[in-house]
């Protein structure tokens, strides 16, 4: 089994999503000691945002020297995603959405003819069979039923984007309200870690 571990938080040691994604990966390692883990830190090694040059290169246009390295990084990211049986993503909420570096990565793996295709009845995802676990952190409370639920363009987007690629086995390990005081923060993290441990059940 192969696991792709991605972090997108711009924070270091204080990142809740990084702490939780590491917990999730540790749970899968304990369950399968032979697990192969590939690590991708999108904050430390960002992928360039999609541009007209990237699209032209995908259609066979000559690649400039300035773009060549970034195209290779994007191709490697796609290959790592395709090879993974399990994908674990640390995804904090920034201004109601995901980190821009995570969006850049998603743009690079969303490739017509490779991870999805257009059929007679609309788009068809080609990545079914993968398991996705998202370690989600939020300063406020935006889960379903909360007054601020309409502001959630983080988990809702990720579910839609990966669903579009055919992934239906999606689990969110969520710690929210982490900016609303130390007690709520510690409680949210503890609850999320319990949910992560339950993945081994």
Curated annotation (Swiss-Prot):
Known partners and oligomeric status: Homodimer.
Gene source species: Burkholderia lata (strain ATCC 17760 / DSM 23089 / LMG 22485 / NCIMB 9086 / R18194 / 383)
Essential cofactor(s): FMN
Record: residues binding FMN: 9, 15-17, 93-96, 137-140
Function, as annotated: Quinone reductase that provides resistance to thiol-specific stress caused by electrophilic quinones.
Superkingdom field: Bacteria
MF terms in GO: electron transfer activity; FMN binding; oxidoreductase activity, acting on NAD(P)H as acceptor; oxidoreductase activity, acting on NAD(P)H, quinone or similar compound as acceptor
SUPFAM superfamilies: Flavoproteins
Positions of transmembrane segments: none
Gene3D superfamilies to which the protein is assigned, alphabetical: 3.40.50.360
Name assigned to this protein: FMN-dependent NADH:quinone oxidoreductase 7
PANTHER family: FMN-DEPENDENT NADH-AZOREDUCTASE 1, FMN-DEPENDENT NADH:QUINONE OXIDOREDUCTASE
Cofactor binding annotation: Binds 1 FMN per subunit.
Record family assignment: Belongs to the azoreductase type 1 family.
Its EC number(s): 1.6.5.-, 1.7.1.17
